[in-house]
Amino acid sequence: AMLAKRKDVTDKGWCDKLSTKLKTAKTQHSHELPNYWLAIGDSHTAAYSRMDSGVTKRDGMTLNGQCRSGFDYIKTILAEKEKRDREYDGYSSLEGITMSFGNIDIRHHICRLNTDFKPLLYQWRQFGESLGIDVEYSAPWPIEYEKRKPPKTGYYKGEPFWGSYNERSEIVSEWISEMKSLGMKLVMPPADWYNINPEKYAKEYMEANSSVHLSPAKYRRKDWGKSALGIFE
C-alpha cells in the first residue's frame, strides 16, 4: 500500500489490513451520504473537520482573498450542495459548516505587509452570520520550528514564511483573542499545544514530510490525537 511508504506511518500491518478491506468496499456517491455538515476552505480544512462532515478544499486560499471576493468560493460550494440536496432529497439537508482560513495569511502575509488583520475577522464573522446556519471558524495553528524545511509548494516569494517565530506567535495569540471577542465559534486544538516547544510540535504534531500541515493522526476527528481510527473494530 502507498500509505505504508509514509514516514509518519509506523504500523505497516494496519496498512495491509486497510488494503484488504478496500478490496471489498462498496462504492458510494457523495449524494448518498448524510452530509449534514460541511467543512470548506484552504488546504488545512480536513484537519478542522468534525466526524461525519463532508470536506471540500482549495489549496492556497487566504482569508484576505475570500474577503475581497465576497466569499464567492464558499457561496459557490454551498449553492452546489443545495442544488444536489434538492435534486436527490427534495430539500436542503445542510445544518452547518466549518470554515478554514487564516493560517496562510499569518504564515506569509500579515508580517510581510504589516497589515491589520482585525477587519478580516470582522468580515468573516459577518459573512458567517449571514448564512442562517450554524458556523464554526478555524483558529490558527501554533507556529512551528523555524528551521523546519517545508517543500517549495509551501513557499511564497521564495520564503517559507514571513516574520519571526515570536512575531507570528504574537499574531496567532491576538488573532484568537479577537475571534473570541467577536463571539466566533472556534475550532481549535487543546490550549497546551500553543505552549509546546516548537521543534517538538513540528516533529510530533505535523506531517513527517516537513509539510506545513498537521499530521492526520492529530486531526480534530481523531480528538486531536487522542483517538485511534478504529476502522477494524
Question: Model features per residue range: what roles?
Answer:
Residues 215-217:
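Short, conserved phosphate/pyrophosphate- and ester-handling motifs at nucleotide-, phospho-/glycolipid
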Residues 36-122:
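Conserved SGNH/GDSL esterase-like catalytic core that processes O-acyl groups on lipids
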Residues 220:
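Short, contiguous, pocket-lining structural segments
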Residues 18-23, 53, 78-90, 223-233:
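Short amphipathic alpha-helical segments
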Residues 85-213, 225, 230-233:
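Alpha-helical cap/lid subdomain in secreted, periplasmic
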Residues 1-56, 153-155:
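N-terminal secretory targeting modules
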